[in-house]
């Protein structure tokens, strides 16, 4: 399948970060299977959040409807900054969480490096971070079908789609 093909190509890749490969050969395919269709990149390579003269830009890579989706490379740690890697000048987790907390227009986001997939929620009313994490590497290396069912159930586009009239 797509994951096995991606891992085979990844093992021959000299680039330890492998952002393009991870996105094109793995994560965008996974998102299609979760019914997001073709997920476009963000306009200008960023999204903005904030108000009253304190609007900031966040280097979120993709967006589906009103859901920010930040896709990093296999070699990028989501909890630490990776110098020289676009979208990881700050820890990707912290950056996406701050974006959600500062935005009035976004409640959910997806974040992944191909190894794990996180579904984040605006947590401005909570202390700390608010996310579910799915270990994609363990799930697909170990063929853990029941874990994939949980991922599919929680992260399917229908879970994050804002219906008309919802705020």
Question: Could you describe each region identified by the protein language model?
Answer:
Residues 26-27, 31, 36, 50-83, ...:
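Conserved catalytic cores of phosphodiester-cleaving nucleases, focusing on short active-site segments
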Residues 1-14, 66-67, 71-167:
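Short, basic/polar, glycine-containing "phosphate-handling" surface segments that engage DNA
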Residues 1-33:
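Charged, often low-complexity linker/regulatory segments
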Residues 39-40:
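Short Lys/Arg-enriched alpha/beta "domain-start" segment
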Residues 25, 43-46:
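N-terminal accessory segment at the very beginning of proteins
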Residues 46-51, 137:
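Solvent-exposed, non-transmembrane amphipathic alpha-helical segments
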Residues 15-19, 57, 167:
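Proteins with a high burden of low-complexity, intrinsically disordered sequence enriched in S/T/G/P/A and R
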Residues 43, 53-55, 147-148:
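His/Asp/Glu-rich acidic catalytic environments and adjacent acidic regulatory segments
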């Amino acid at each position: 399948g797509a994951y096995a093909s991606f891992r085979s190509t990844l093992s021959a890749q000299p680039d330890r970060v492998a952002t393009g490969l991870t996105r094109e050969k793995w994560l965008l395919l996974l998102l299609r299977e979760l019914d997001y269709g073709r997920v476009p990149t963000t306009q200008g390579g960023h999204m903005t959040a904030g108000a009253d003269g304190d609007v900031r830009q966040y280097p979120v890579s993709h967006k589906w409807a009103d859901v920010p989706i930040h896709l990093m490379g296999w070699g990028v740690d989501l909890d630490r900054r990776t110098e020289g890697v676009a979208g990881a000048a700050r820890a990707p987790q912290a950056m996406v969480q701050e974006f959600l907390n500062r935005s009035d227009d976004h409640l959910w986001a997806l974040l992944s490096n191909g190894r794990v997939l996180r579904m984040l929620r605006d947590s401005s009313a909570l202390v700390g971070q608010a996310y579910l994490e799915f270990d994609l590497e363990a799930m697909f290396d170990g063929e853990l079908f029941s874990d994939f069912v949980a991922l599919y159930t929680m992260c399917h586009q229908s879970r994050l789609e804002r219906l008309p009239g919802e705020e």
